[in-house]
Amino acid sequence: MLRSLVGSEMCIRDSTGSVATGLLIASRAGMKKVTLELGGNDPLVVLKDADIDRAVNGVMNGAYLNAGQVCMGVKRIIVDESIADEFTQKLVRETKKIKMGDPMDKNTVLGTLIDEDAARMVEETVNNAVKAGAKILTGGKRDGAFYEATVLDNVTPDMDVVVNETFGPVAPIIKVKSTDEAVSYTHLTLPTIR
């Protein structure tokens, strides 16, 4: 498909997808115009003076909307360690309230991922984070194309769940000691097109 997109007589290429695919399309487009809507890996930073309830609400809407399948959704949470326990407890409590099921049911908050393969990829990413030392505080289970809203603690900035975009309902928490450390962690992802 990529060959047909790049090699055709179209005047402009427009693609939505992963950063890797976007880089490939851009590198082969020659002098043709390219518009790319690529994945993101957006942090939500919660500093010690934050309104914790508002921050939790930001995660609930940003990490779990459309089962976490939003390119500009919250993909990692960077929290000052002085408020991390309170923030994490509230986030876990709210996450446990999420009803997963048929999206046609008005009470359902979390539906399926795009397909079972996507849910397996999220499951693998979370399992790898756990093997590397992360702890599942709630969620972490897959049933077909469903994947539970998941909160991960003990996450480090070098884990795949942080470095790469996890396209599912996962909220990895990274604790920091200072504002400077929080800011430095916002930049620790794979390179993207700017």
Task: Label each region the model flagged.
Residues 20-156, 178-180, 184-185:
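ALDH superfamily catalytic-core signature
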Residues 1-7, 12, 187-194:
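Single conserved hydrophobic/aromatic residue that forms the stacking wall/gate
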Residues 128, 162-163:
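Conserved ANL (AMP-binding/adenylate-forming) active-site segment centered on the GW(Y/F)…HTG consensus within
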Residues 144-147, 164-170, 188:
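Conserved glycine-rich beta-strand-loop-beta hairpin in the small C-terminal domain of fold type I
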Residues 174-176:
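Short acidic-hydrophobic, aromatic-tinged amphipathic segments that line or gate anion-handling sites
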Residues 8-9, 13-22:
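Active-site phosphate-binding strand-loop segment of PLP-dependent enzymes
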